[in-house]
Amino acid sequence: MMLDLGEYQEESVNIIAIMGPHGVYHKDEPIKELEAALQRQGFQTIWPQNSADLLQFIEHNPRICGVIFDWDEYSVDLCSDINQLNEYLPLYAFINAHSTMDVSSQDLRMTLWFFEYALGLSEEIATRIGQYTREYLENITPPFTRALFNYVQEGKYTFCTPGHMGGSAYQKSPVGCLFYDFFGGNTLKADVSISVTELGSLLDHTGPHLEAEEYIARTF
C-alpha cells in the first residue's frame, strides 16, 4: 500500500526547491505556473540563489522533497552533487527541443525525471511531482513505521491500549482534552499493542514486524 502523507504533508516533508529564474519567458512562465500549482497541492517552494546555496539547504534541511532545475544550465553535475547528499531525493529537470541529453546508464539510476517547458501543463506536472514525492517518502520510511502510519490514516481503532477509540476517551473531561491536545491525535491513535494483526506479530516474526527486522539487519 502506498504511503499517503496528505493529511499532514503541509507541516512535514513538503519543500520543493526551484532553481531560477532564467530571464527568458519560455522558461520562467511555465515554472511560475508550476509553482502556483504545487502550492495549491500543499507544497512550499523556495528559490536558492545558486547551486552552492541549494546544496547547503539540502544538507541542513531534511524537509526538502524535490528539486526543479534547468537541464541546460545545471545538467548532470548538479544531480551528482545532490546525489552525494541524498540519493533518494527526486530531481526534476526541465528541457526544451534543443537540449542535449548527455546521460549515462549510471546517471539513469538517479531519481531523475524530465519535463518539457510548456504552458498549460502545470496541473499535470504538479500531480506527477506529488506522486513522485509519495514514492520518495515510501522509499525512505522503514517498513514498520510505514505500516503504522497507514494503520492510523485508515482510521482503525483498538481497545487493547490507552489510545481507546483514537484517544476520544480522553476528551470527556477538561484535563483529558489538555492531555489529548498536548500529545496530539496521531500519538494516541498509534498507541497500539503487539496484538494488532495489520502490523504483524512481534512474537511470531510476521508481517511488518518481520519486514522491520529484516530491514534492520540489512541496515546495521
Predicted regions and their residues:
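Conserved N-terminal alpha-helix of the aminotransferase class I/II PLP-enzyme fold
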Residues: 181-220
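Conserved acidic segment of CheY-like receiver
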Residues: 12-28, 34-38
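N-terminal cationic-hydrophobic initiation segments that often serve targeting/anchoring roles
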Residues: 39, 58, 82-86, 217
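Alpha-helix termination/capping residues and helix-transition junctions
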Residues: 10, 60-61
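Residues that mark the start of a beta-strand
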Residues: 12-16, 44, 87
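Non-catalytic signal-transmission and effector/linker regions of two-component phosphorelay proteins
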Residues: 1-14
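A short, well-structured beta->alpha microelement
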Residues: 2-3, 35-60, 76
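N-terminal glycine-rich, Lys/His-bearing helix-loop that initiates the first secondary-structure elements
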Residues: 31, 50, 54, 62-192
